[in-house]
Amino acid sequence: MSHVTRFISLLVALLMLCLSAAFAENSGSITVVDVLDREVTLPVDVEKVVITFNFEEYFAVTGAAGVDKLVGYSHAYWEGRREDAWTTYTTAYPQLLDIADVGYNDNINVEAIIALKPDVVLMSAPVNYTFMETQFDKFDAAGIPVVFFNFHAQTLEMHRASMELIGKVMGDEARGSEIADYYEEQMNLVYDRVASMQEDAGKPSVYMEFSMGPSQYGNTWSTRMWGALIGQCGGRNIAADLGDANSVEIAPEQIIAENPDIIIFTASPRNDVSDNVVLGYGADAEAARAALRSYETRTGWDSLNAIQNGKLSGIYHDLSRHIFDFAGTQFLAKQIHPELFEDVDPEANLADFFAKYMPVELDGVWTITLED
């Protein structure tokens, strides 16, 4: 093939690419690649949305305008698991109460979603993909695109990809990228300082537990969720060898034997538990601190390093696996290595994020220590 022929072939290829892009734009559709490397074609102007998880990330991109674009969502995730967030959003936007419930997890109502005729369905890959593997043909037949994001991976790269993806889908790529940049800057406050630690600086031992009240031992985390974050923040998780499940049980005797340097409870409102630590929207600092102190009375805990040194704290459970979870990571890092993060104020940074990007006001208490 001559140089001239090759040049002409290249020009033809470029022309076809430009024509293809122009056709897609003129036809009112775009193609995105989701976090599962699936190419998905959807309308340029999305007006009707169904979402099953990570509502805050959607609203961070759309603002209040996103409420009117919702035609269906999973009520059980919000109303059933995160009562404080549910109350906050439905108080600010009562119309959310009238939007269709499309089910949750393995009980997603595919027929109900199809009947709503959304322009796009937004789903969490780790939460919804296994169920959806047998349902794609129904959505394809109805011409309804499904896009997957992933905030469960707890990596900077996947958070960024997911946030930028939502921005593209909702027609505001610039905002999605801006939020991703903000997140990266906040996370690097932790990553850079932990990376600068001397190898012989030591890793304090950490125990984390889902607060269920002092009389009941909640689950802990091994290699996932909070367990993974302990390592990222320069700590040693005493439950690291207990398996790879989402959460794991630990014997009370093992906690005492491990004698952790730091104990952190994750907390959220639960209607079925009256004496747990309550943090999040609308939470009260003094009530949360009193509940936190009640854990000091557990049998054998008076001998633990964490209790003797006042290293007992609490954090809102959903300051993980969200685009605002940088505040949770910063708080965790500050508890583990206070000397490295003395100038970092996680709740102030969280408040700044909400003021910039969220369509509801930040109130309540999201982290708590004994010293405040």
Predicted features along the sequence, with ranges:
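Bacterial Sec-exported substrate-binding components of ABC uptake systems
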Residues: 6, 19-59, 174-209, 341-372
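Alpha-helical, coiled-coil/dimerization segments enriched in small aliphatic residues
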Residues: 219-246
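Structured C-terminal subdomain patch of bacterial secreted/periplasmic proteins
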Residues: 100-101, 154-168, 177, 181, ...
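Bacterial N-terminal signal peptides that target proteins for export
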Residues: 1-11
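A short, structured surface patch at a secondary-structure boundary
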Residues: 57-115, 120, 124-127
